């Protein structure tokens, strides 16, 4: 038995200079797992609660000492003596201890950090890599895939201080033979984009996720400069590289309208879906995330009707990694993919349940970071261990993003042909 003998919580810093929760789980025999909770900027209203202290005299109210005290107090007391390999049982103990729908008593940041640390400790106890342990927890032992990266090379919206409304413009190196080659392609495009922007006299400062954040006159202009960079880097857009958007539309949804203030345009629900469809006809955009507000379910039905057969429509704020909400989406034919952020739901077990449910319904699952990250690279192991096939973890810049890519390189080196890189076949509507 992988007996838990200690649980330790502490306050550490995330990539935006805000505190977050880190946890350690110690087992008999000297096995230790350590993990940190990420934090989002554009968040869905139904996400599990990230517990902050609210004490304006510390970290402008963003401290997490209460959540840390919950780790070191009630969570520790409840888990001492338990078996770390029994992940579902551990997570249920913490969920029951919290007793709320959205984990607002103990904090999803406290529960998640411990949940992931326990998984890492259990993997160490079993003498196997984390991705292999996750595959076993998922009921899919030995089934792996290297994910196609969605590389966020140009930022707008809540992730940048500029006049671009769409939050993320991403490249996907679908023509690569393996993950290592995909990473190289993305890096070359990233550096070429910097030259293109510099040549136009535009800013090459970066946003929260490492993408550039220049002032451009329209969202179409953002796509045009990316196209230029891809081609200048020696790649063919639509064959070697495809494009993906994260609209984060809830951020510019006001009074039932979609207000693209950067462009000076206002759309109704169907009009904004038509606008996005027109972009997919001009550029090889194969994936659109949060193309409408999380509450605009009628609009989502229309968007899925006009684009769902050819374009991957990803629900992030829409589904918030929640199986109850995903069930409603599946039953109503809303979207065809789910973004997986484990801090939206607050435990590894619930995260795996959402991935399994999505796959069973023919939806894809895209594993994702948050804009506030740490050096913790658990999502790399999660992507491979569930064979999710796609990952969003930012640009080729900032060590909090690159840490995940580097972990994926290590995993691919270990697994070789046991973890295929399937490129475009992983993306809904493109197989």
Swiss-Prot record:
Highest rank taxon of the organism: Bacteria
GO BP annotation list: glycolytic process
Molecular function via GO: magnesium ion binding; phosphopyruvate hydratase activity
Active site feature: 209 (proton donor), 341 (proton acceptor)
GO CC aspect terms: cell surface; extracellular region; phosphopyruvate hydratase complex
Keywords: Cytoplasm, Glycolysis, Lyase, Magnesium, Metal-binding, Secreted
Positions that bind (2R)-2-phosphoglycerate: 167, 341, 370-371, 392
EC number: 4.2.1.11
Recorded catalytic activity of this chain's protein: (2R)-2-phosphoglycerate = phosphoenolpyruvate + H2O
Pathway terms, separated by semicolons: Carbohydrate degradation; glycolysis; pyruvate from D-glyceraldehyde 3-phosphate: step 4/5
Localization terms from the record: Cytoplasm; Secreted; Cell surface
Residues noted as binding Mg(2+) in the record, renumbered to the chain: 246, 289, 316
Cofactor(s), names only, from the UniProt record: Mg(2+)
Cofactor binding, note field: Binds a second Mg(2+) ion via substrate during catalysis.
SUPFAM superfamilies on file: Enolase C-terminal domain-like, Enolase N-terminal domain-like
Family (UniProt): Belongs to the enolase family.
Primary role: Catalyzes the reversible conversion of 2-phosphoglycerate (2-PG) into phosphoenolpyruvate (PEP). It is essential for the degradation of carbohydrates via glycolysis.
Subunit structure: Component of the RNA degradosome, a multiprotein complex involved in RNA processing and mRNA degradation.
Protein name: Enolase
Originating organism: Shewanella sp. (strain MR-4)
Gene: eno
